[in-house]
Amino acid sequence: MTAILLLALQLASAQGATDETSRARALVTATDAALARGQYDDAIKNAEDAFAAHERLGRHAEAAWDLNAIGVANSYLARYPSALDAFRRALDLDRTSGSADGAITRLNNIGNVRFMQGQYSDALQQYQEALRSIDTAPAATRQRLHKMTASNLAALYQRLGADERALDYYGELSSDRTMQPAEEAQLLVNRGALYRRLGDPITALELYRSAQRLYSTSGHRDGEISAWRNIGIVYALEIGDADRAVDAFDTALRLARASSNRRGEAQALLYRGEALRRVGRSADAGRDLQAALDAAVGTGLVEEQWKALYGIGRVREATADRQGARAAYEAAIGKIESVRSDLRTIALRAEFLADKRDVYDALIWLRAAERPAPIADLFRLIEQSRARTWQDRLHADRASPSLAAVQAKLPANTWLLEYWTSAAGVARLWISHDDARIATAPAQADAETAIRDFVDVVARAGSDWQLAADAAGRALLAGLPDASDVTHLLIVPDGTLSFVPFEALRMADAAVVERFDVSYLPSAALLTRDRAAPSRWTWPWRRQLVAFGDPAPARAYPLETRPLPPLPYANEEIHRIAGELRGGADIHLGPDARKALALDGRLRAVPFVHFATHAVADTRDPERSRILLAPRDGGTQPDYLFLREIYDLDLRDVALVTLSACETERGKIVRGEGVEGFSRALLAAGASAAVTTMWDVADRPAAELMTQFYYALGRGASPAAALRQAKLTFLHSQLPWAHPYFWAGYVLTGDGSVALPRVVPWGVVAAGAVMMLAVVMVSIRAGVSAKRSTFPRRTAG
């Protein structure tokens, strides 16, 4: 009887388990259907019931996927704390049950929530952990998990402005033929955003439309909202078709509201408001933008908050509410700065401001119209909008410098000339130790053309350059006060002005180089760096120079797209330089010009470092800009000193680094940062100043100019004054080398106004030694005589 009863109980239990399993399966199906339809609250309810059923059955891996569905639904509803809680609980279950597949998915989803909240460092950390874990997943799922993670990384880098890194990931994903429709659609959307930013809106629109069709046929409501929004963005911001843009945003808004997708609703309102603003419908635009701001604040969407505030500011400015516009712009910048401060690595910050510089520009241009102009505030804003990542490397714990702090560092003979450029207009600030002035002008096509023509002319030997230099000088130097006691210019360029050799501009019938020493700065923040004053003299046995020249060639250079000619004058250049400096020299030529010798610490404690080698400025990936050195250990493979490695050098005691190579001042221009080139890396590594080149110059005149430069340095001139003297020697030579092509491309970045230690000549040392020896001998003789005078004399007894 007992056995029969036990059997009955087992059968009943099995039947109950089967019923519970069937119920859980049905709930999972209902959850998936509700998610696809955008019925997120229903999806959460079904997933919670499925989770309870799976927990009763002891199926923790399945329960983790129920929690994942709860997290996804809450993400669409912009309930980010609830989403994070669900994903974290799911991750705990995954790790308990040993589900690598589930854990990697959860890490990606936690990263996605952090991405939506604008917490990009945290998002990157989650994605990278997921990427590292993929090899622990079953072989059958690795490809899918890698696609998911790579797609998220691409979207993150795209958001941060690192378009080239994003394109690398998208290129990798595009070759995958196993994508599901929703995955393919998401890739199309992301690639479309990149093409739009790279200036190809037609291709972007085609990609968005293809994505919208894929999302629609696969029933992916959130993806379809994204596709319609991006279609509207192209019509509004690129093509200028406001009617089609508004139609697309209306569709996105209707779909978002039908599924309670609050993030989608905020974004549709935001971009519809921008479309309306662009066609002058200020009242309607203001309402949409305020509604977008309210929705973004309510859901914690920081990216949408600053964009809405920026749009509100532009609406207010258009309706003459200048105070309201200023308040909105300042609030938008506050949001941007809060996100930037959360980016914990330099790599993430590098291009973060690229698509946000417009907000700073709007506030600068608005405030520049005030009378009197608030110069101190404008200076702070301009510095805040430029070279921020470089400033972080220079002073990790400091804000952008104040006008007063910079003025306190300026000598009486120096002007700081700081430029700011935008689509609306340009500004020039000239600042001395006791004065500051500003001049503004609307953007003018004639001035921009004159500057472009000048840069083109001076970079071509034999061209007639004076007229172009006059026109560009009027565009860039108009209004510069006449002060005969000022002999040194510190220039902080902006944007493409970074490629203008100001010394070759003409003012009052003379070239700038005939009137001023000139140095360039990435930011005025460099002037606030604490540095000890150099000694006036140094001993001749102390090392003055470490130099690398004419490295032994490698068998092939796979990174280079053009042949590298020999440098027959590099050896002569370095030996002549060493002779002009007169102190000790550590010279590495041919096979000895190796990277290992540049990294072993020998650069740390010398005044001068010199490279007479080939160098390449990589405008696609600045960190891969490189100085070519000899193959290591007598091999045949090329060796490079990369830009990213230069940042890590310790050059705090180096007064001057010279890169006597082609185009070492070129580089990628990043909005909000400037030119990512060698000079910035050298200054951030601690060097006081750097000499680099804007274009290719023939080997022989390059060697001669360097000799003239170091001749002046060796006789006590400051780097800025020495470079000016070398350029004037060329300019007044009555030879073909008088053309700016041969001398204007050499630029000094850094302060460069302080004279460097002069070497005490060996003759003086010898004379001093002789004098000291004579003094010693006299002292000895005097001592002997004194001792003799104290001896008792013997007398006859």
Language-model regions, residue ranges each:
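N-terminal leader/linker segments that initiate helical-solenoid repeat arrays
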Residues: L7-D41, K45-E48, A52, R56-L57, ...
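Conserved alpha-helical positions within TPR/SEL1-like repeat arrays
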Residues: R25-A36, A61-Y76, D101-M116, R144-R159, ...
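Eukaryotic all-alpha helical interaction scaffolds
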Residues: A34, F51-H54, N74, D94, ...
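Short coil/turn connectors between adjacent alpha-helices in alpha-solenoid helical repeat scaffolds
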Residues: A34-D42, N74-S82, R114-D122, A155-R165, ...
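Tetratricopeptide repeat
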Residues: A43, D49-A50, A83-A90, V113, ...
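A generic tandem-repeat structural signature
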Residues: V72-I134, A140-M148
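Alpha-helical solenoid repeat scaffolds used for protein-protein interaction
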Residues: D176, Q180, I202, R213, ...
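Catalytic cores of enzymes
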Residues: R380, S385, A396, S400-G797
